[in-house]
Amino acid sequence: MQVERVDFVSFLTQDLARARRFYTEVLGLEIETEGESDLELRAGQVTLDVFDPSSIGQPFAPSPAGVALRVADVDAARAELESKGVPFDGDTIVTGVCKQAWFKDPDGNALMLHRRFDV
């Protein structure tokens, strides 16, 4: 088997309308497709799928794993999101390879603003 690429990353939501507002109005992502129980958004070359698990009788649980959203300037992007009322989980982290700032969507799914130093 050879994996060609990641087609999408999925998050669960308890409120699709609220998730739509957050991902489009706050993060500025564009909707690719939208159904009754899910929403697919374009994030660069990856699709984020936001899905209401209650539509298939499954329980909700936020994802603590996190998705790194690459931005040109982590500090500027963080300031922009903070001005829109998005709280961050601690200070911006600088490692040997990147800068990152962690936050959550309204359902508690972990996200980070991210930039590698070599890119």
Q: Where in this protein do the model-derived segments appear?
A:
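N-terminal beta-strand motif that seeds the catalytic metal site of vicinal oxygen chelate
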Residues: M1-A17, T47, A65-L69, F117-V119
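Vicinal oxygen chelate
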Residues: M1-Q2, R78, E82-V119
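Amphipathic alpha-helical segments
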Residues: D15-E30
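Short amphipathic alpha-helices within nucleic acid-binding modules
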Residues: F22, D75-E80
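Short secondary-structure junctions
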Residues: G28-T33, F88-T92
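Conserved short beta-strand elements that form part of the metal-binding/catalytic scaffold
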Residues: E30-P62, A110-R116
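Short hydrophobic/aromatic beta-strand or adjacent loop that forms the aromatic wall/cage
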Residues: E36-D38, G66, C98-Q100
